[in-house]
Swiss-Prot record:
This is GTPase Obg. It comes from the Bacteria. Residues 159-330 form the OBG-type G domain. Belongs to the TRAFAC class OBG-HflX-like GTPase superfamily. OBG GTPase family. The lineage of its organism: Bacteria, Bacillati, Bacillota, Bacilli, Bacillales. Its EC number is 3.6.5.-. InterPro entries: G_OBG, GTP-bd, GTP-bd_Obg/CgtA, GTP-bd_prot_GTP1/OBG_C_sf, GTP1-OBG_CS, GTP1_OBG_dom, GTP1_OBG_dom_sf, OBG_GTPase. Monomer. The gene is obg. Keywords: Cytoplasm, GTP-binding, Hydrolase, Magnesium, Metal-binding, Nucleotide-binding.
Length: 431
């Protein structure tokens, strides 16, 4: 089964908790603090595996949670870092934030990696807080929470050649002849509803990857008939093979078919106009095909359009087509697809990391008049504080003051004894 778009949830591993411990050894008076740091949580990394061709694995498992780091130990021993969770994806996978649709990574080459959800830092042990003023701190820090994000994975096939055209013009039949691919073939429209890939080898030992794309219809560039799902796979092909039913057996005019498909390609992505194209006049074994081809050439009236007449039924001129495709591929330069897509979409692509929002905090009111403080920075500190330790609670209060939260609460009208909430935890405001 071919799957080219999925939505999944990611939760990177939390950092391990630091520990409060002291050095207790014979003949070592005033040993001091000896609590070790927690280990770092596991990040979630996407890696390209050239052996994959679909996102099928992500259809049945949509939630991924990485492991947390181990806790710190006494004698200043650091907790073990968690092993990163590596998710394999096929070449051509684009990772977007499900909320903002920002492109987080565009993975093309085999082995390419992108860290999309970063694991939390391990919490610090009490020895890390020692100072001349407080040489034996009796508190430690919890691990930092790992990032949590929903992403959309979108696959754009990486094929050298894309077969385009109206339904039932012979695209799947051609692919089955020139490669070992076994696409579904039937005497009805839209037999192919998912792209098929095949590796093609010419008699002079040249090879390329060909994609049989589902049939297009008028309005495909506007999404009609699942047009967007099909057209996106054309974007990354280097050569377009435009197949036309020259017999007109479906009651359509070959020249009109040619114009409509090219207009849809241009409307979807204007750079596709510049992509090398070979026109395949198929079904030349049928009645009226020769006359239709002569009229077609007359209507185009452009010698630069490369037209190859053939019959997939009789296997005529197949080698001529394959040689022409191989020649076009050798002549075309490498195309930087990612750059083109960024210019069109106006996106800022962030590869190998996800940068969260840096908002400090916001203050709102609950229905019971309690003040609610929210924001990534303060919520991160809240989760990393051990509220079973009075010194840790006092440190959290100092951090709130240094961030300006106390002053902001006063400005909002908060008075002595009022309730302040952070992530469900309740505090009493004290002047």
């Amino acid at each position: 089964m071919f799957v080219d778009q999925v939505k999944i949830s990611l939760k990177a591993g939390d950092g391990g908790n630091g520990i409060t411990a002291y050095r207790r050894e014979k003949y070592v008076p005033f040993g001091g603090p000896a609590g070790g740091d927690g280990g770092d949580g596991a990040s979630i990394i996407f890696e390209v595996d050239e052996g994959l061709r679909t996102l099928l694995d992500f259809r049945y498992q949509t939630h991924f949670k990485a492991k947390r780091g181990d806790g710190g130990q006494s004698s200043n021993m650091h907790g073990k870092n968690a092993e990163h969770l590596v998710l394999k994806v096929p070449p051509g996978t684009i990772i977007k934030s499900a909320d903002s649709e920002e492109v987080l990574a565009d993975l093309v080459e085999n082995g390419q990696r992108a860290v999309v959800a970063k694991g939390g830092r391990g919490g610090r042990g009490n020895s890390r807080f020692a100072s001349p003023r407080n040489p034996a701190p009796d508190f430690s820090e919890n691990g930092e929470p790992g990032e949590e994000i929903e992403v959309t994975l979108e696959l754009k096939l990486l094929a050298d050649v894309g077969l385009v055209g109206f339904p039932s013009v012979g695209k799947s039949t051609l692919l089955s002849i020139v490669s070992k691919a076994k696409p579904k073939i039937g005497a009805y429209h839209f037999t192919t509803i998912k792209p098929n890939l095949g590796v093609v080898s010419t008699k002079d030992q040249r090879s390329f990857v060909m994609a049989d794309l589902p049939g297009l219809i008028e309005g495909a560039s506007e999404g009609i008939g699942l047009g967007h799902q099909f057209l996106k796979h054309v974007e990354r092909t280097k050569v377009i093979v435009h197949m036309i039913d020259m017999s007109g057996s479906e009651g359509r005019d070959p020249y009109e078919d040619y114009k409509v498909i090219n207009e849809e390609l241009s409307a979807y992505e204007h750079r596709l106009e510049e992509r090398p194209q070979i026109v395949v006049a198929n079904k030349m074994d049928m009645p009226n095909a020769e006359d239709n081809l002569a009229l077609f050439k007359e209507e185009i009236n452009d010698d630069s359009v490369h037209i190859i007449p053939l019959s997939t039924f009789k296997h005529d001129h197949i080698d001529e087509l394959l040689y022409a495709i191989a020649d076009k591929l050798e002549a075309v330069k490498d195309i930087d697809f990612s750059k083109d897509e960024e210019e069109d979409l106006g996106v800022n692509r962030v590869v190998y990391k996800h940068t969260p929002s840096q908002d400090k905090f916001t203050i709102t009111r609950d229905d019971d008049a309690a003040y609610v403080v929210s924001g990534k920075a303060i919520e991160r500190m809240f989760k990393m504080t051990d509220f079973n330790s009075d010194p840790a609670v006092r440190r959290f209060a100092r951090q709130m003051r240094s961030m300006g939260i106390d002053d902001a609460l006063r400005a909002r009208g908060c008075r002595n004894g009022d309730i302040v909430r952070i992530l469900g935890g309740e505090f009493e405001f004290v002047e």
